[in-house]
Structure formats: C-alpha cells, structure tokens
C-alpha cells in the first residue's frame, strides 16, 4: 500500500510536468504499476488461506526455508569474518558480537524482499508467460554497487532450492522429471576473481540449507544440498586424479602452504571461520572418486568438521567430473566454461540428462569415463577407516534442469565477449527446457533468467541479443533515474 501511495504522488508530479514529457512519465508510472501488481500477486501466493491450494502451501514452506537459510547465511558470514580478522575470537564470542546488533545483523532491505516476492509466481509455476511464454522476459536487478543485489538473488535461489524439493517428481509428456536432485540454480560470472569472492558467500548459504535438510529430511529430501564451482582448469581441477595429485603434492611439501591446491577455494570454514589445514583437512577418497573438504575444528563442534554431524564435510564440489556425477543444487560458473558443452558430453548431466546412477560414484551419462565407474556392481571396500558397502548401477529418470539462471554483472557481457556468450545462450536455453502438462495443453518450460548490474545502458537491446527475451528492470525508475 505504501508503494501505491508513492505512485499516486508521482502521478501528481507527472501531471505538473511540461506536455512534451508526459509520454515518458506515463510510461514510467505504468512500469511502477506493473511492479505493484506483481508484488501483490507474489504476496497473495503466500497469504492464500485456501487449504486446498497446494501451490500456496508449498510456497509458504519454501519461503520459510529461504528466510531461515538466509538468516543463517548472514549471521554465519559475519561470524567467519570476525574470526578471520581476530583469530583469538571463539565462535561463541563472535556470535555474541553479532547478537548484540539485533535485527540489523540479519534483515531484508525493502527492495530485496520486493524483488523476491515479484519472482515467486514464476518459480512456483514454471509455465507462467513471463517465464515460459512465446516472448519470455529476463528480469534485470539494477542497483548501485554495495546496495545488496547479491542477497536479493541468493534469497531467490534459496526459495528455488526449497520449492523444487517440495514439488519433487513431476509427470511430463515425455516422461518423469525428478526435482529431488540436480542443478536448481545456475549462476554465471564474467570475471574469475569475482567468482572466487562470491563463492564463499554462496557456500555459507548451502551450509545453512544442508543443515536444515538434515534436520528434516522428510520435507527437504535425502539428497544433499551442494554447491559446485565450474570454472577453468587453471582455477579448479578437471579430473579426480588431478585433485588427488594436488593433495599428495601439498602433503609432501614442507610448511603449511596450500599453493597449487586449487581444489581448495577458501582458507577457512565458511560456517564458523576456523582455519582449514590444507595438509590434513582436504581428503581424496578413491573408493568414491570424491574430494572432501573439512572444517579445521578439532573439537568437532562445527558440523562440517571431521566427526561433525554433516559427515562428508563442507557441501562443496570443485572438480569437474565430481560435478558431473553429483550435479550440485547451486552451480557457479564463468561464462567461458560453457564452451565445454561442445566437448564433454557428460556435462549434459548439469541439465538433467542422466541415464543411470551408481550408488557409490553418482550419476552416469553415456560419456562418463569407464575409469570412474565402468562396472554394474561394486564390492564392499574399506578406505581411510571407513567401509563403503557394495553398490550397484541402476537406471534413473531425467533430473529437473535448472529453474533459475543468474547472470551477474550483465554490463560486462558486451562486444566480442557478448557475441561469444550469445552463441551458447541458445544451447543453454534449449538444454534447460522441458514440457509440462498433458497433450495439447502441454507447455514448454524455460528457465527464469535474472541479471544484475550496477550500471546499465541499452539494456533492452543487450538482453534481446543475448537471450532473445524482453527485459523488465527492477526497481522501476518511474520519474527519476
């Protein structure tokens, strides 16, 4: 209602403008009214009291999940930051510092919550025209640097994690789509340095999501929430053997340096801030072809430490073939990495195209290397003080492809880079599409595309050429830039 009153005041201002400015002013106010309508639609989805409305019930659960995990992400990120600045601080001491800030330590800004509410209908119902119509739209979050754009789209990502788990298996004209696993959100960056900076914040969110899942697997499923970093081979390893060799080399070196250990992307635990020992806390397991990164907490108070409640350590994947075999819920990538789609068939698993699943090694695509999982059955095996039970390979349905694609720093995708990225967008859009409904009523579902930037120019033209979509800028500028 407050936004509606504000728009009414802008209408009065517009009427007082010179006649030649009225068309532009009218267009700006219409954009504001459209945002108001969408905001109310999203809010009504959460407040619908109809007990028979499955969509509203699921939306409320996913919204609560989002708020819980984002609160934990904010608080835990600050705790880790305080402990990084002062290693003498304990987790309890850092927590008290954050608690003293009250609600300010973890609260939404108005534009963040409004942006999320506006997108909820497109996530809950994948067939809505704004997302999957003949002329779908891309949503552009335009806000100054440091204003909180990251939290806005991380919040929407968390909602997406939750709603997919609640919707579960969906019948489609071409067969079953399984939303209980697979990549839910695909987030792309242009600069590799920027990816590393954001990876820590996103990992903290995934830690919060995984703890919530473990507390209530009946609601949030048996499959772990994980985050993956899919970037160039100079930044992270392509194969398990490369990662294993890195770990061996670091352990054989003098000192405690993590130089050359690209499988480890942060020096301290994103959940509690405890330092990670590259010689002891990064473990390669041949039996599963997995690399586990643990928090360095020796008292096992952190759930992601050895002996902690999480079991497998931090929910992080940084090796390409691990990512293909265990498609992470949240995948962070650089735009150049999508060139691998033309050369690595197993990367199709990121879009749900899997044919089998090994109980030990993960999902299989016809191009999965037989050196990783070439048998139909595996005998029990002991390694590192742990026994891995016998495992078999079983046929599975297609995993649900990404529902949300986030492009950070859109203004950098221009010129020659924009031309190259645009070539892959059609492929990504096609790989992420699937049909929902029955017979003639079946609708082609496309991913929701969100872009963010602190500076924008010719956004309509840029988005049309990159994604073949119209663009909706939020917040609408109305009468003032």
List PLM regions with ranges.
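N-terminal helicase ATP-binding lobe
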Residues: 1-481
